[in-house]
């Protein structure tokens, strides 16, 4: 898939999936070295398997890894395209306790016209439905998202739609980027938003995410849950 703002496909070419057995071997080796959590990552992990025999999906890979490496304590997923999450992945989310209750969605925007001009495959309503379905299966689920602020042609009203969705969906972990032109991409030829306005809109989105995170942390006070300490530092 090629979004209008993204230069990555031009640099990296088409997706190339590792065989499930090879991934399981890598995870098994990491666990043997003492790693307790593995994060599956890639340019577009929801497209996993489209170039492999039998077309296994990301959901099938998750199931295979958790079965093949029972010693793995925690499996986490990196950024997910909400238009390409398969049914097996949702079933794994509901049934596999070792799959972390955290989904990071590659939303980029939450206004339908902006999404269309980005050439994204999901609509605003699609994203809401994905969040609703996932939370129904996993009530303790935490959602994050990637967002681009000030995409070409984005009006204040379009930005406000994205800002409202951050609050509606209670997105607590945001990766927000002011739009940055990439030569050779279709978006670079579109009418632009002034750079200071892009930065201001990005700050608004980050502030909304920070407020959501503060509320989430407040609800966690008094709970006892297993955690993974990642570094020797406070905070």
Describe the role of every protein-language-model region.
Residues 1-21:
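Canonical Radical SAM [4Fe-4S] cluster-binding loop centered on the CxxxCxxC motif
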Residues 23, 58, 127, 159-162, ...:
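Aromatic/hydrophobic pocket-lining residues that form the small-molecule binding cavity
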Residues 137, 157, 161-206:
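C-terminal, non-catalytic macromolecule-binding modules
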Residues 181, 189-235:
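Terminal RNA-binding accessory module
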Residues 32-157:
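Conserved SAM/AdoMet-binding glycine-rich loop
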Residues 11, 43-45, 179:
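Short, ordered loop/turn segments at secondary-structure junctions
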Residues 3, 23, 40, 77, ...:
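Conserved, mostly hydrophobic/aromatic
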């Amino acid at each position: 898939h090629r979004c209008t703002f993204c230069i990555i496909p031009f640099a990296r070419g088409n997706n190339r999936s590792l065989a499930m057995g090879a991934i399981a071997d890598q995870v098994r080796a990491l666990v043997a070295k003492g790693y307790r959590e593995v994060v599956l990552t890639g340019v577009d992990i929801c497209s996993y398997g489209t170039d492999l025999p039998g077309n296994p999906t990301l959901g099938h890979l998750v199931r295979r890894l958790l079965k093949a490496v029972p010693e793995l304590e925690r499996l986490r997923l990196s950024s997910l395209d909400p238009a390409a999450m398969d049914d097996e992945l949702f079933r794994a989310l509901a049934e596999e306790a070792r799959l972390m209750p955290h989904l990071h969605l590659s939303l980029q925007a939450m206004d339908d016209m902006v999404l269309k001009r980005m050439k994204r495959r999901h609509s605003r309503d699609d994203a809401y439905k994905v969040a609703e379905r996932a939370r129904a299966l996993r009530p303790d689920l935490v959602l994050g998202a990637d967002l681009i602020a000030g995409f070409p042609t984005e009006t204040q009203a379009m930005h406000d739609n994205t800002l409202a969705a951050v609050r509606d969906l209670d997105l607590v972990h945001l990766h927000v980027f002011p739009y940055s032109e990439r030569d050779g991409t279709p978006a670079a030829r579109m009418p632009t938003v002034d750079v200071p306005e892009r930065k201001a809109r990005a700050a608004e989105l980050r502030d909304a995410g920070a407020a959501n995170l503060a509320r989430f942390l407040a609800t966690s006070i008094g709970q006892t849950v297993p955690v993974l300490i990642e570094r020797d530092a406070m905070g």
